[in-house]
Amino acid sequence: MYWSILAVGIGGALGSLFRWFLGIRLNGVFSGLPLGTFAANVIAGYVIGVAVAGFARAPQIAPEWRLFVITGLMGGLSTFSTFSAEVVQRLQDGRLGWAAGEIVIHVGASLLMTMLGIATVSLLSR
């Protein structure tokens, strides 16, 4: 149990720091368009796809590694709460089109990247 707690905690800390770094580096690129949040979510989507498919093909890997990568690292990196707050801010500002676009792009790209991650493992495993 202690290894599981450490795996999630350390992974979560590292993922959160990477998300923070992406925000610092990318959120100022386009005014009003939080690219850091988008990058965090699509990167996490891809890596989660790779991880889910990879761990499914390698059940001998200790479960703590799955907890570290998926629950900790990618859980800390991906940010549904920040995405939600940004969309609500657009709605409060009366920017309904921006809010709708952000929802479609974030969710669509994240799902697409997860599928791409799974497909990557599938192709590399042939």
UniProtKB/Swiss-Prot annotation:
GO terms for molecular function: fluoride channel activity; metal ion binding. It comes from the Bacteria. The chain crosses the membrane at residues 4-24, 35-55, 68-88, 103-123. Belongs to the fluoride channel Fluc/FEX (TC 1.A.43) family. This is Fluoride-specific ion channel FluC. The keyword Repressor does not apply. Na(+) binds at G75, S78. It is found in: Cell inner membrane. It catalyses: fluoride(in) = fluoride(out). Na(+) is not transported, but it plays an essential structural role and its presence is essential for fluoride channel function. Its main location: membrane. One of its GO terms (biological process) is cellular detoxification of fluoride. InterPro entries: FluC (IPR003691). It is a multi-pass membrane protein. NCBIfam families: crcB, PRK14196.1. The keyword Kinase does not apply. Fluoride-specific ion channel. Important for reducing fluoride concentration in the cell, thus reducing its toxicity. Keywords: Cell inner membrane, Cell membrane, Ion channel, Ion transport, Membrane, Metal-binding, Sodium, Transmembrane, Transmembrane helix, Transport. GO terms for cellular component: plasma membrane. Signal peptide: none annotated.
